[in-house]
């Protein structure tokens, strides 16, 4: 089954690189052995990902060190997206495909 997560980007998400993990992100994280409900603050899991142009990056599912908020980090995102865009993370074998406004 192909799991997808969608994120509606805001200025804060892009400029501070802090993205809250919504319900769809939490479901996708489980497919990569990271269940937010079973992890403690500071825990993280990095997964290889790919942009449509073939560029390799990294998606990190993590719980913030201080309060344990559920978060996700996507490297190189500023180069591909801007505030108002919708980012789709799509499960693809052992990696994640990153799609912008798809």
Model regions: which residues?
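Acidic, low-complexity intrinsically disordered regions
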Residues: 1-102
């Amino acid at each position: 089954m192909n799991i997808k997560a969608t994120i509606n980007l805001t200025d804060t998400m892009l400029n501070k690189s802090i993205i809250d993990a919504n319900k769809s992100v939490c479901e996708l994280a489980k497919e990569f052995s990271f269940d937010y409900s079973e992890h403690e603050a500071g825990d993280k899991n990095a997964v290889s990902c790919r942009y449509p142009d073939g560029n390799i990056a990294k998606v990190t599912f993590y719980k913030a060190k201080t309060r344990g908020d559920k978060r996700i980090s996507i490297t190189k995102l500023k180069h591909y997206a801007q505030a108002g865009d919708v980012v789709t993370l799509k499960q693809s074998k052992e990696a994640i495909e990153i799609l912008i406004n798809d």
